[in-house]
Structure formats: structure tokens, C-alpha cells
UniProtKB/Swiss-Prot annotation:
Function: Catalyzes the formation of N(7)-methylguanine at position 46 (m7G46) in tRNA.
InterPro entries: SAM-dependent_MTases_sf (IPR029063), tRNA_(Gua-N-7)_MeTrfase_Trmb (IPR003358), tRNA_methyltr_TrmB_bact (IPR055361)
Protein name according to UniProt: tRNA (guanine-N(7)-)-methyltransferase
Organism: Chlorobium phaeobacteroides (strain DSM 266 / SMG 266 / 2430)
Enzyme superclass (EC): transferase
Length: 204
């Protein structure tokens, strides 16, 4: 589940590299837990953590370079309520989080994997949404924003029988992340927002 650790990562207390380090996070006593899937350069994660210092924020990312970069920014902002996890998101939710433990999940501009042969790599399949439902507290939300209309429509088709109520809309830029700025530079200024609210618990 955990990616191969590197010495520089192991020495950084912000970064979770193994199960022993994960166990040091007492999820039952952590209070409100928010999880960002694929935090990239970490802009949104750091803003949320700064706005809500009483909450625990866990960022999941597969790219070690991003994790190292963001961990330095966490330190420079003196934020002690962020932990970074180098992992595949699907494995992290399956293996590390118990049922009814997460208050909010967000994923801004996940990879849409547009080629048909790569569709199985997409996050938020019906199976994954059922797992996500199980890990979220009743009434809590998952926010997904994408630049791909095709990916948005695909996700909406995955939603039946996942226990979520859904709101979907087209929104202007508002997150000021690296990917959002990238699209703005290319004159792409509308994005697709899916807000999922847990309305029924799903056993997995």
C-alpha cells in the first residue's frame, strides 16, 4: 500500500511512509478529518489547513517529488495539522481509513485518462464511490472538480446505488491551483463540479 520510502521522506514527520507512522495518527481522537486526493502543488490543501487549524488534513499523492515540495511548504507555513501520504488513493481508502471516519473529501482536477484503453485507471468508478461512501461520515461531502466534460459525464453514470445525493454544475475558476491556472492560460475558464453528499451508508 505504501510506496517505496526514500531517506529524505522518512526523516520528515509530515510525511507518512509506513504503518507505524500511520498508527501514530489516532483517527478516533482526531476530530474533523479532511482528505485531498491528488493534492499536486498543495495550494488548496494548505489554504484549507490554514483556515481550519482545529481539523486534521491528510493529503494523498503518488508523486514523491510533489510530496517533498509540499512538505517544505507545510513547514514554512508552520502548519502542524497536515499529514502527507505517498500512496494510491484507492489503496489508502481501502486499507487505512475505517468506516465513518472522514468528514470531507475533495479531488481537484484528477487525471481524466481520456483514452479508452486507460479508462480503468480513472478514479470514482462505482466500486470506488461505494468505498468512499463507506469511509465518509453520514451527511458529509465529497467535492470533485474536472476540466473534462467527458470525465464528468462518466462519473455521473457511476453514481447509482452508491448512497450519494449529487449536485453537478458548471463553475468559473475559483481554486487557484496550478492546474486551474494552466487551463486559464489556455483560455479555458469553465469547469465541471460534482458535489456528493452521503445520504445512505453503504457496507463494503
Amino acid at each position: 500500500m505504501f510506496m517505496d520510502s526514500r531517506e529524505t521522506l522518512c526523516e520528515n514527520p509530515v510525511i507518512i511512509t509506513d504503518r507505524d507512522a500511520w498508527k501514530e495518527i489516532n483517527l478516533k481522537d482526531a476530530g474533523t478529518i479532511e482528505v485531498e486526493i491528488g493534492f499536486g502543488s498543495g495550494e488548496y490543501l494548505l489554504r484549507r489547513a490554514s483556515e481550519y487549524p482545529e481539523r486534521l488534513f491528510i493529503g494523498i499523492e503518488k508523486k514523491p517529488g510533489m510530496i517533498t515540495e509540499v512538505s517544505k511548504r507545510v513547514a514554512s507555513h508552520n502548519l502542524n495539522n497536515i499529514r502527507l501520504l505517498e500512496s494510491c488513493a484507492k489503496d489508502a481508502f481501502a486499507d487505512l481509513f475505517p468506516a465513518n471516519s472522514i468528514s470531507r473529501v475533495y479531488s481537484l482536477f484528477p487525471d481524466p485518462w481520456p483514452k479508452r484503453k486507460h479508462l480503468h485507471y480513472r478514479l470514482f468508478s462505482s466500486e470506488y464511490l461505494r468505498l468512499l461512501n463507506n469511509r465518509l461520515i453520514f451527511g458529509s461531502e465529497a467535492l470533485i472538480v474536472t476540466d473534462s466534460e467527458d470525465y464528468c459525464n462518466w462519473m455521473l453514470k457511476q453514481l447509482p446505488d452508491t448512497g450519494f445525493e449529487v449536485e453537478n454544475s458548471i463553475i468559473p475558476p475559483q481554486f487557484d491551483t496550478r492546474f486551474e491556472r494552466k487551463w486559464l492560460e489556455q483560455n479555458f475558464n469553465t469547469f465541471f463540479r460534482i458535489l456528493l453528499k452521503k445520504a445512505r451508508h453503504i457496507e463494503t
